[in-house]
Design a protein with these regions (language model features):
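Metal-dependent nuclease catalytic regions and adjoining charged, substrate-binding loops involved
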Residues: 42-148
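Non-catalytic protein-protein interaction segments used by genome-maintenance enzymes to assemble
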Residues: 1-37, 45
Length: 148
């Protein structure tokens, strides 16, 4: 979602995400999530000729599960809110790191003519990597047979 504030002449790019219970500190520090929104800011600036300092970014997180006020797992009244907002850092250094990350990915995965590079990528099984892998239960294609 992109909004425009006429008085300050600034744009805000809002990335709406869903989460079971909201984002913890680990999710907020996930650079891949931050880089996605930072790159939206960069490309929006390039496409429409808007200075970067006139573009703000924000995550708007919708919680799928909200605890009741009398739930014993409720640690704070703020935990019961259905939405959560997070504004990641978006200065020049962070934006530069996002651009470097996407360019490194493109250079590693694609040839200069746009074709996919054929390469061998070593398996790196871990709780996080295997959790999202489509082959996590496919011992024939994975070969690791690791289940978390």
């Amino acid at each position: 979602v992109v909004t425009y504030h006429e008085e300050t002449e600034t744009f805000k790019i809002i990335d709406i995400k869903t989460s079971t219970n909201g984002w913890n500190d680990y999710a907020k520090k996930d650079e891949n999530k931050q880089f996605q929104l930072l790159l939206y800011k960069q490309y929006f600036s390039e496409q429409y000729g808007i200075p970067l300092d006139k573009i703000e970014i924000e995550f708007f997180i919708l919680k799928r599960k909200v605890l009741d006020a009398d739930d014993e797992n409720l640690m704070s009244p703020y935990q019961a809110y259905r939405v959560q907002q997070f504004i990641p850092p978006s200065g020049k250094i962070k934006l530069g790191r996002a651009k470097t990350a996407i360019n490194d990915f493109i250079n590693e995965c694609f040839k200069s003519n746009g074709e996919i590079k054929e390469s061998s990528y070593p398996k790196s099984p871990s709780k996080w990597n295997c959790n999202f892998c489509p082959y996590k239960e496919d011992k024939e294609n994975c070969g690791e047979g690791i289940s978390y």
